């Protein structure tokens, strides 16, 4: 699809998370506010746009919307770059972001942890997302480091109990897959392109690098020699000679580095956060950043509930216009959720019975709320184009409760 809109939007090939580099795509930038995670700004960019280049423009737009520059701007690791952070701070703004794992400071601190334990302090407990019967714990390594790449921003180190579990499961899964691949490789050696020791070692190391476990496993290729004595062709006689042959072959062996594994467990659950404002307490830095998943939830709703497929609109200007419509639908959806949840909290009500079998919905979403009204109908008896009688289905307790929380009268609902 060719063409460009007046705002400069066009489709381009870019990095495809669906592994479809043949498809053109777009970048949908979305910003939400802290109050109810309501979307307040969006913009679409060409598909080859680097996410890091959008933060300055987004921050400037949010400053115009908010009317001030001292709000806290939270972003992912693409925000963690000197041009973006310096621009925000030079204009009296504040930012919090997670530090990319390839920064030197991250590897340096991990090496310190691998060498020996560092004192940390429990600073926050909160219910585990999607399972409030369990608790997630966050700890903070006492003291803070000043980043050496940017020279002026506070870098805080945290540990999550749930992330520690995920890191351990991920490492065990990678080790298991690496071992399975090494077993497959071991039956292929001594033939084809795997007859030399160097080629076998290279193939084994490629497997470890692919699974990111090269520092956790040790590879050994052992050389073996097999000698045989073979009779030459011909009749056995006084002049009969024997021929000796020697065949060289290799075997592949591997084992886990127990010391490296023990050291790696010390960095499980670790993640660093950067704050441009040193006056914000580490606990507050953590709580502010942990609001970020609500933005990911909006993106999930954008794809799953609204089933956005902008390329079906055929024309480039229609795509841009319909992305704005999707943004408005996300905003309305978020406002409904915010209204209902606030009313439940202020009135200290019990969770709504929105799920089948009258199960509780402690955090009702707009899609759940609207589904409760599915199947409700209005019936009209007409004669000669005139309505004689009109009936509606009976609303149950949950229906009336939801309408009350949304400040909608029952008569108004039937007129919608």
Role assignments for model-derived ranges:
Residues 1-416:
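Anion-binding and metal-coordination hotspots
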């Amino acid at each position: 699809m060719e063409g460009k809109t007046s705002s400069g939007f066009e489709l381009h090939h870019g990095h495809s998370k669906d592994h479809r580099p043949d498809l053109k795509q777009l970048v949908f930038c979305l910003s939400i506010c802290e109050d109810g995670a309501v979307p307040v700004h969006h913009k679409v960019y060409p598909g080859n746009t680097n996410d890091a280049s959008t933060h300055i423009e987004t921050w400037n737009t949010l400053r115009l919307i908010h009317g001030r520059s001292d709000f806290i701007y939270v972003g992912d690791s693409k925000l963690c770059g000197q041009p973006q952070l310096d621009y925000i701070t030079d204009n009296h703004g504040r930012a919090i972001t997670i530090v990319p794992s390839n920064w030197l400071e991250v590897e340096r601190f991990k090496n310190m942890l691998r060498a020996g334990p560092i004192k940390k302090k429990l600073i926050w407990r909160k219910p585990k997302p999607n399972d409030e019967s369990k608790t997630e714990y966050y700890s903070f390594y006492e003291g803070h480091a000043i980043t050496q790449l940017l020279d002026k921003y506070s870098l805080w180190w945290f540990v999550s109990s749930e992330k520690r579990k995920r890191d351990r499961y991920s490492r065990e899964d990678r080790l298991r897959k690496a071992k399975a691949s090494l077993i497959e490789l071991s039956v292929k050696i001594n033939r084809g392109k795997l007859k030399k020791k160097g080629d076998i070692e290279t193939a084994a190391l490629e497997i470890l690098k692919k699974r990111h476990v090269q520092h956790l496993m040790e590879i050994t290729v052992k050389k073996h020699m097999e000698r045989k004595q073979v009779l030459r062709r011909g009749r056995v006689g006084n002049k009969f000679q024997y021929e000796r042959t020697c065949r060289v072959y290799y075997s592949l062996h591997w084992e886990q580095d127990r010391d490296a594994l023990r050291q790696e467990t010390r960095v499980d659950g670790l993640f660093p956060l950067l704050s441009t404002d040193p006056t914000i307490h580490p606990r507050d830095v953590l709580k502010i950043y942990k609001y970020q998943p609500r933005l990911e939830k909006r993106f999930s709703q954008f794809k799953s509930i609204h089933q956005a497929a902008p390329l079906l609109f055929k024309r480039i200007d229609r795509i841009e216009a319909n992305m704005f419509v999707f943004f408005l639908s996300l905003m309305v959806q978020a406002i409904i959720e915010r209204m209902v949840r606030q009313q439940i909290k202020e009135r200290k009500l019990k969770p709504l019975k929105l799920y089948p079998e009258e199960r509780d919905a402690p955090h009702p979403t707009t899609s759940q709320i609207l589904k409760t009204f599915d199947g409700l109908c209005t019936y009209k008896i007409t004669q000669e184009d005139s309505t004689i009688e009109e009936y509606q289905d009976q609303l149950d307790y949950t229906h009336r409760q939801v309408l009350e929380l949304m400040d909608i009268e029952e008569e108004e609902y039937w007129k919608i």
